[in-house]
Amino acid sequence: MSLRDRFIQPDSKAGPFAGTITGALIACAIAGGSVYAQPDQSTAESEPADESPVVLQQIPDAQTPDAQYPDDPDSGDRPASAGRVVRAFDFEEREYNPLPIPLGWLRAQEDPDVPRIRPGFPIWNGATIEYNAPAFSGIGTARLPTAGGSTSLTLRHGEINIFPNADYLVSARVRTDGLEHAKARVLARLLNEHGVAIEGAVSTTPLVNTKGDWQQVALEVEGVYPDAAFIQIELELLQPEQQGLAHGMNKFAVWEQDYSGDAYFDNLIIAQLPRLDITTGLPGNIAESNEPPPLQVLVRDLTGDAIVARVRIFDVFGREVARSVLPNHDRRLRTDWTPDLPGFGWYRAVLDISVDQQLVGIRTLDFIWSSPGEANINSGMFSIFAELTNPIIAESAPALIKGSGVTRASIETWDINTQSESLVDGSALMNTIDDLVNAQIDLSMVFSQLPRELATTLAVDPDEVMPVFAGPSPAWVPWAGSMLDEYGQAVAHWRFGDQPTLESAATLNAELDRINSALRGYVPGPMIVTPWAIDRPIEPTLTRPNRQLLLMDHGDTSEAVMPLVVEEWFASARSQTQGKPDQLPSLGMVLSPSHEIRTWSSVEIWSSVGGLARKAISFWWAASLTGLDNDRFDLELRDAWWVSKGKRGQVMPAPEVVVWKTLATHLGGRSAIEQIDLVPGVHMLVAGPQQIRANAQTSQDGRFFAPGSDEAQAGEDESGIMILWLDEPSLDPVVLNLPVSMGAVSSFDVFNNETVIDLERVGGLSLPVHRIEIGRSPIIIKGVNTQLVRFLSSIKLTPDRLQAKSGIHHHSVTLSNPWPITIRGQLYIVEPGGYTDPDGNIDRSWEIKPRVLPFVLDPNEQSELPIELAYSLGELAGEKKLSFDVELQADQDYPLMRLERTIELGYDGIEMFATARKAQDGIVIVSVHVTNLLDVVQDFELIAIPPNESRLRRSINGIAPGEQAIREFAFTKADSGDQIIVALLLRDSSIRLNQSVTVP
């Protein structure tokens, strides 16, 4: 029985082709629709009803648009259109179809005899049903050839009737052969009962060129058209001119095309999908609350199949954190389910439906659960980009901007599809801008592209926004004049174009001067924004007053680049303005997620989240160190959300949105103080107290108070913060053991989850300590005593490298006073020496004089306290623990505190490392590599000392500067785990460098 025969039966179930539907769902996902691949494609298994924490309710028939269907979908005869697979075409028609094309199909080429006017689809391209070409299955396939121009094969209207409120999936196998420019796709359109196409009711698969391979493509048709009666399918081979690439810009363009080649289609299936919806019901799907948001779940299936439905929640790491299995005996269900989530963050909810353990429907939802927004917080330079040219985003824009925790936003008001009617008073776009202005959002207007109509009128490329505004023609005035009139007094920043410019500095300056003159009639003192590639050297002449250079970052940069570009810009700006702060220009930075936000890869997402946070913090830090006001900088996040495909599309936020909110909440209004060094390999930044928003404030009872007043300052956070992360990736976190205040502090991750870290008292001396775990992703420690941390960080040994030679070594202990008052106290050097050993075992091989160092420091004074060190010649090289116990009287009498550092014992003129290996005969071979780091010839003696046999000696004579020598030792009695000491002696000196190597 053919595929066609199997699926024209009235009682068709998904049957053996449910797997095909599953594959089509995944193909539809890859196409960028509202469903996409998940970390676990397994289908819902049957689970006991009591494992589901959610109680579902049936939708009353009278309240639903599908009330026309019987209450029992299994009762009576069911038409084919009510089955899971509505229609299937396998093109196996050789036995009964004498026509050159499949039954029920027609060649939709341009034909004046029909008449059918269809430019680009010449009549000489005729689709056929082919039995000799390789088919995906069987022998039949639909072939669409080209001899120049595009080709179409269209299903006659009335062939497939549908339910108006049901969703459908169209899947096909496609293969192209001999094509270079042309591509293939499947199109589906909805028709009304008269066979007339419904406006806007068209869906397509992606255009593909498979280069001879079979590929599955799929599309989804949403049941949002109440007058839909039929679905019409069109198979297409499209040349570039028909692929939608032109945007109607150049009517005289010469298009490349193929003059030979074919597209083949096979196993075309039209299947009815369950109606699935899942949402938070909140604009932008951002929930700001102390409790997890309830998810609104809708399941409706009209096929009569026994379905199993489940909802699963995944976190940013791809871990399943919550699940609900819906009772499988209901087919029209609605529920509000509140998942038990582990903390604030970004989550992906997956609602899937299966029949006989085969996936037949899936919907996903990306949402954010974040902490409630804090009133009066100044987000500083943090900003976000919102595409108001997308109506769905525009509708949610106020909530999206609020949910990202910022008080600044760049809003896209023009793109190529902008219509003139959307730019007049009372339009949805203008109303949204009004809402943002009234919410006191500091806006930057972005004209990303010229509207198509304007670009066509001027015969220019739509990306040439700046040249058009700088030109003599006033053609832009009807498009931008009303917006400039309306918002010129409230908006200072205006961006013309949204891609990094390639123009020379001279050309740009001329254009910017003309634009500035044109805008002065609308905007007092406009700040004109110029996008600039981050890897392009900054032109000093562009750093002028009333100019903002907006650096466009890309995913290949690291956080180390941020301070470099800020320093480069600052130097140029000062040189151009003779250092006058009131005339300095502005600098912006645009950051984007480095991952594809629609797809699933937990490792990629988390890496992107951490990388973006480090970049943002590094830019904020470098900008703050310039001493300029935050108003001189913009740190913009873009590509922060996406809109799911389809008429029911909703805004899906990226994980970076909640990261941005966390950074804006904690860093906005703060100033950089100092980068400190307490733990090797850990980035440590100390920032000061946070200021409230600069504008006037209103209390909860409605009373007005001015910024800086006692009432306003009473709510300010006077404590500082530390920002910590590992400089390099590590499987294990590093623990900082240090008192950073005299009370509990709070650690916040990038999703603003708070962990309270109590001040512990440890050991017999009851030393205060906070234990702070530090990973690659930044954490923010709040409640920090910044003077105390800076003081402890200033205590260090200089030089911090001990030379491996006999005798007394002269060093100093440095420390400084960050308080505005005089401080005093004592330092005790307790390691090296064993004075921290709980059993009291003192290490006499180290001599340090004096071990007790009293100090008195005036405000901002730095002191060096001299000490002498001596140690045994047998001391092993490498890192050594250096510990200070600190007594301090400053702004308070602090308890005895311990500071732990590391110092290195080595020799500056030598690099040595040793390895051990076992040969096949059991002999242990120790290899020693010695490199001369000085610019003079050196001579060495090597001694290898095993535990159970005689020591061996080797010489290295005349090793030249920069050269390396290798010597080997063989031992017959060494066992696994034995430590072999290798001593390197520089001839005619007291230098002795000792290393140990472990026998494997």
Protein language model annotation of sequence segments:
Residues 761-796:
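C-terminal beta-strand-rich structural cap/linker in extracellular carbohydrate-active enzymes
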Residues 343-366, 787-793, 806-809, 872-906, ...:
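Terminal connector regions
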Residues 464-496, 507-522, 540-542, 615-617:
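An active-site-proximal structural segment forming one wall of the substrate-binding cleft
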Residues 679-743, 823:
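Carbohydrate-binding surface patches
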Residues 39-342, 352-364, 371-388, 419-420, ...:
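Extracellular and organelle-lumenal recognition/adhesion modules and their flexible linkers in secreted
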Residues 477-507, 534-536, 545-554, 585-593, ...:
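Active-site groove signature of glycoside hydrolases
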Residues 589-591, 600-685, 689:
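Aromatic/acidic polysaccharide-binding cleft in carbohydrate-active enzymes
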Residues 396-403, 409-464, 505-534, 563-566:
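Aromatic-lined substrate-binding rim segments of carbohydrate-active enzymes
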